[in-house]
């Protein structure tokens, strides 16, 4: 099995059966007024933090995030762009995209300001981004640069 296949399978399994110990932390990066993070999103936080600072997220930036995990970062980014498809989440693992979709339903229930359609989930990878040129203001990733090799 190739490196990319192995990585895909690890994240597929993590989407189907959340693995709290898979990565560095389950704590939200930011604590913002009126933002509540569903427990399942915290359990599925397979990142090590954010490469984005909240002060850089002004004027409704169109955002792209690669490696959706349980959707926690996407929810946090949506706090700053409360528009339909204001945040694009990209992942190669179908099961992770589906888990995030489900988690956004829970996020809507506990965050009156949040709508699932603020996040546009897309299948794809960082080497071939399924977005138009010059359409993104802020881009970030979920600690995945180690798997961006062709094989």
Regions found by a protein language model. Name each.
Residues 147-151:
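A short, conserved alpha-helix within the catalytic core of class I
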Residues 140-144:
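A short beta-strand submotif of the Rossmann-like class I SAM-dependent methyltransferase core
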Residues 59-128:
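Class I SAM-dependent methyltransferase SAM/SAH-binding core
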Residues 128, 145-146:
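Active-site micro-motifs of SAM-dependent methyltransferase domains
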Residues 127-139:
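A short acidic, Gly/Pro-enriched loop at the edge of an enzyme's catalytic core
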Residues 24-62, 73-80:
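Conserved alpha-helix/loop element of class I SAM-dependent methyltransferases that forms part
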Residues 1-27:
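N-terminal auxiliary segments of SAM/dcSAM-dependent transferases
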């Amino acid at each position: 099995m190739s490196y990319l296949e192995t990585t895909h399978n690890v994240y597929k399994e993590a989407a189907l059966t959340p693995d709290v110990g898979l990565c560095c932390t389950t704590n939200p990066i930011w604590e913002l007024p009126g933002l509540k993070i569903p427990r399942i999103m915290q359990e599925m936080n397979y990142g090590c933090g954010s490469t984005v600072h909240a002060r850089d997220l002004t004027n409704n930036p169109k955002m792209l995030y690669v490696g959706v995990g349980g959707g926690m970062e996407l929810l946090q980014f949506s706090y700053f762009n409360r528009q339909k498809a204001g945040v694009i989440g990209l992942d190669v693992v179908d099961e992770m995209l589906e888990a995030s979709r489900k988690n956004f339903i829970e996020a809507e229930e506990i965050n009156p300001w949040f709508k699932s359609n603020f996040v546009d989930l897309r299948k794809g990878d960082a080497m071939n981004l399924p977005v138009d040129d010059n359409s993104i203001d802020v881009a970030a990733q979920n600690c995945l640069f180690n798997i961006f090799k062709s094989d």
